[in-house]
Design a protein with these regions (language model features):
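Right-hand nucleic-acid polymerase module
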Residues: 1-53, 60-86, 90-116, 121-123, ...
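A generic structural motif
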Residues: 195-199, 382-384, 419-426, 481-483
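N-terminal activation segment of mature serine protease catalytic domains
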Residues: 337-375, 382, 394, 418, ...
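Terminal peptide-recognition signature
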Residues: 358, 374, 380, 384, ...
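A structural micro-motif recognizing beta-strand termini
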Residues: 359-364, 387, 402, 423-430, ...
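Catalytic-histidine neighborhood of serine endopeptidases
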Residues: 361, 368-371, 377-419, 427-428, ...
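Flexible, gly/ser-rich surface segments that form the specificity/activation loops bordering the active-site cleft
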Residues: 431-480, 486-492, 507-518
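C-terminal subregion of chymotrypsin/trypsin-like serine protease catalytic domains
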Residues: 497-532
Length: 532
């Protein structure tokens, strides 16, 4: 295997943080004395607790967890290295705003998948390699030696130390560039999540193999092109021969444990295991379930925390409004009421409680009331069209499920030119949900949903009308959205939603007597409020 220095032929051009410029600055940053550093230097192995966790299929993963003092120093080192490291696009492990989900999403709808695993990933990164990395960054040699000593145990990078993730990514920086180039030349997608490497394409991954691609299933890494195997080898890593898998369009395709078909999804077996665990708690009690958990993982683990983490994972992958997540979370909340999971409302539930009837009376009582629609918008309040409340002496809003429970409101802000109004109210927050403001850039052909109460009468419910954006005109300097669906009288002031259920616009005018149907673009609202 090449020596540590050979991995970094030329120095890497970065700005070294002040705390890493000398031993004196480092000690000051650590808030430790030279004597204390000496103790850590010689007795660091005593500062780790080792234990195993289950990886499934009877396999175990060794975790080396540092004690509080050493963990604090490693966390400080990680924070100092963070501004230096600029992750490449294919890297998803241990990177802010990236995750197993983003890693899998990169391969969404690919028909051919190749999964590789780096053998002994953390243990392959030796103390000498870490010291060599630090020196290549331009860090003082003595400081590089100290950093490597604190971050490593028994001569290698320990799995369980807070500094190991970023250091491992920095060590892989050159390899990621090489694998990214190979993927580009082979016309496929490359990603890496820690030790999990994935290549995918819409076509067979022929250019990654010396011969034709193997049949779906596990295969020998010897079938891979020497250049691909060499990229791992030249960077001090080896491909795990037990974890090399190829999947074609007729087989099950997974990336970092997630299924990728039309959407990224959780394996059904994972969900079944959660349901089984909840069933044991429901029928036999927490004590029996706790014992089962200990027997499986070989150590004490809080049952509630274990289930909470797994159910939260389902919600992260499938979405907080997914019915499977909501069902699991609801069962969990009944069993562990003191540690409840938040169950967010679905898009349908939000729109059912976020859209209200607005009713106003003018100066002439003989004219009766005029009705329109209003809705609640996050960070804005209760929004409607100005023409729905223009000239009103009294305004009330109510939810159609409680027509007798009317709330008096007043106009807080209005813009007649844009036909917009924000209403001041004292409605309890428990009575309504709020929409998000859309962040999309719209174009003709995008799907929309208009909500409102046309010709509202007793017993009526919210009217939902689906359609497309037909054009995006600007009328008298006001951006508008023209839609295909009819916006009948009474829907004015209601929300026009995008495909995500966020507000794209405010219904303006339309109906059978109008040739065209318009909503005021939500940008007109946000621009107005930013200067109002």
């Amino acid at each position: 295997m090449p020596g540590p220095a050979s991995f970094f032929v030329t120095p890497i051009q970065v700005t070294v943080p002040n705390e890493l410029t000398s031993e004196a600055e480092l000690l000051k940053f650590f808030a430790v004395s030279a004597a204390e550093l000496k103790k850590i230097w010689w007795f660091r192995s005593r500062m780790y607790q080792k234990f195993e966790i289950s990886k499934g299929k009877g396999k175990k993963r060794l975790i080396s967890a540092p004690d509080h003092r050493l963990k604090m120093l490693q966390t400080k080192i990680a924070s100092s290295l963070a501004p230096i490291y600029r992750p490449r696009n294919p890297v998803h492990g241990f990177v802010d705003n990236r995750s197993v989900k983003t890693n899998a999403t990169a391969h969404l709808r690919s028909k051919f998948i190749m999964n590789l695993d780096i053998e002994g990933f953390f243990s392959a990164i030796t103390e000498g390699r870490v010291s060599g990395l630090m020196s290549a960054l331009g860090i003082d040699g003595r400081v590089a030696e100290i950093l490597a000593r604190i971050c490593c145990n028994e001569g290698v990078l320990p799995q369980g130390a807070p500094s190991s993730p970023i250091i491992s990514n920095m060590i892989c920086f050159r390899m990621d560039k090489q694998l990214q180039r190979i993927a580009k030349e082979s016309r496929c997608i490359y990603t890496r999540y820690a030790d999990d490497v994935t290549f995918s394409s819409y076509q067979p991954l022929t250019l990654l193999f010396e011969g034709p691609p193997p049949p779906a299933g596990n295969f020998s890494p010897d079938l891979l092109k020497d250049g691909l195997r060499g990229a791992f080898r030249s960077n001090g890593f080896a491909i795990n021969p037990q974890k090399v898998h190829y999947a074609d369009k007729h087989s099950r395709r997974t990336v970092t444990g997630l299924k990728i078909n039309e959407i990224v999804n959780v394996d059904r077996k994972f969900v079944r295991n959660i349901r089984a665990a909840l069933f044991v708690v429901e029928k036999q009690g927490a004590a029996v379930a706790q014992k089962t958990l200990k027997d499986k993982y070989g150590r004490e683990a809080a049952l509630a925390s274990h289930l909470r983490g797994r159910i939260s994972w389902v919600g992260h992958i499938k979405g907080p409004s997914d019915p499977i997540f909501r069902s699991l979370a609801s069962r969990y909340n009944k069993l562990f009421p003191s540690e409840k999971l938040e169950i967010l409302p679905t898009i349908v539930e939000i729109r059912e409680r976020a859209v209200w009837v607005v009713e106003h009376w003018g100066g002439d009582a003989t004219e009766g009331s005029v009705q329109g629609t209003a809705f609640f918008l996050k960070s804005v309040g209760l929004v409607t069209a100005w023409h729905c409340v223009d000239g009103a002496t009294e305004i009330a809003v109510y939810h159609p499920s409680k027509p007798s429970n009317k709330f008096k409101v007043t106009v807080a802000k209005n813009d007649a030119h844009r036909d917009l109004a924000v209403l001041a109210h004292e409605i309890p927050a428990t009575e309504y949900y709020e929409f998000d403001i859309s962040k999309r850039t719209f174009k003709a052909g995008d799907n929309t949903t208009a909500l409102g109460f046309p010709g509202f009468g007793p017993g009526d419910k919210i009217n939902v009308r689906s359609g497309l954006i037909t054009s995006l005109p600007i009328k008298s300097a006001v951006p508008m959205i023209e839609v295909a669906q009819k916006l009948s009288q009474g829907m004015s002031g209601g929300p026009l939603l995008d495909e995500d259920g966020a507000v794209a616009g405010i219904n303006y005018k339309g109906g059978p007597s109008e040739a065209r149907d318009f909503a005021v673009h939500v940008k007109a609202l946000t621009d107005w409020l930013s200067v109002a």
